[in-house]
């Protein structure tokens, strides 16, 4: 069973949408498990303080290393990878999602305010992970993105395992266009090759479409694809 731990100030956010549909069914069937930790509970003062002002001045507040470290130490699993969700981190991609799906468990720390005391990251061997070049108000939304990208790769979660292999990024390319009934809609017809029944021609068409779309929309991916 694949396991995830979420360290957050808002435990009621979870499991949220991950308790619905295929992921909810997989959770019930114990394909994966989720533990949610409110790290505010590690604070011992009357006000349960988890943040403070940064040394050297500056705007905003920082999460305190001592509070988060205590929460992590009380809950971490042996050998698991711990990620702090941050725009400074390594960017999540399909390759990393697949890598994480092969772990036994991961922990995700949902940040708030202006960030976290840097000493926490170095002393607890925490990796920083980003979902993109933009800023969110908190790490919870990013945690959902990470979990969504990983859970669908776990064996037994998707109804059609083959569908994982046909999607964007699986072969280094963006996904080809797809069509369903009706065959003609608003005077636009489905491409004839998809109606031919010739699987080799369909495969070639889909590859050429994926290549063309990737070349125009994601030249960075296209360059990597050409090198491989």
From Swiss-Prot:
Keywords of the record: Cytoplasm, Methyltransferase, S-adenosyl-L-methionine, Transferase, tRNA processing
TM stretches of this protein: none
Catalysed reactions listed for this entry: guanosine(37) in tRNA + S-adenosyl-L-methionine = N(1)-methylguanosine(37) in tRNA + S-adenosyl-L-homocysteine + H(+)
Molecular function GO terms recorded: tRNA (guanine(37)-N1)-methyltransferase activity
Biological process annotations from GO: tRNA N1-guanine methylation
Domain of life: Bacteria
EC number(s) reported in the record: 2.1.1.228
Binding-site residues, S-adenosyl-L-methionine: 111, 131-136
Localization: Cytoplasm
Pfam families per UniProt: tRNA_m1G_MT
InterPro entries for this protein: Alpha/beta_knot_MTases, tRNA_m1G_MeTrfase_C_sf, tRNA_m1G_MeTrfase_TrmD, tRNA_m1G_MTases_N, tRNA_MeTrfase_TRMD/TRM10
Enzyme class: transferase
CC per GO annotation: cytosol
Chief localisation class: cytoplasm
Family note: Belongs to the RNA methyltransferase TrmD family.
Function: Specifically methylates guanosine-37 in various tRNAs.
Binding partners and assembly: Homodimer.
Record protein name field: tRNA (guanine-N(1)-)-methyltransferase
């Amino acid at each position: 069973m694949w396991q995830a731990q979420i360290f957050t100030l808002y435990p009621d956010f979870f499991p949220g949408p991950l308790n619905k549909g295929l992921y909810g069914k997989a959770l019930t069937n114990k394909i994966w498990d989720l533990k949610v930790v409110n790290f505010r509970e590690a604070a011992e003062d009357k006000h349960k303080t988890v943040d403070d002002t940064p040394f050297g001045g500056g705007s905003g507040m920082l999460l305190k290393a001592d509070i988060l470290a205590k929460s992590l130490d009380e809950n971490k699993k042996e050998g698991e990878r711990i990620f702090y969700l941050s725009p400074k981190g390594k960017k999540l991609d399909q390759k990393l999602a697949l890598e994480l799906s092969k772990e036994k468990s991961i922990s995700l720390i949902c940040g708030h305010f202006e960030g976290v005391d840097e000493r926490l990251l170095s002393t607890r061997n925490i990796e920083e992970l980003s979902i993109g070049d933009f800023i969110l108000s908190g790490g919870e939304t990013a945690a959902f993105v990470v979990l969504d990208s990983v859970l669908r790769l776990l064996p037994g979660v998707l109804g059609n395992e083959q569908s994982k292999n046909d999607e964007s990024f699986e072969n280094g390319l963006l996904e080809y266009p797809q069509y369903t009934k009706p065959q003609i809609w608003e005077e636009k017809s489905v491409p004839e090759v998809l109606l031919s029944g010739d699987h080799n021609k369909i495969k070639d068409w889909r590859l050429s479409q994926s290549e063309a779309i990737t070349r125009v929309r994601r030249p960075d991916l296209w360059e990597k694809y050409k090198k491989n």
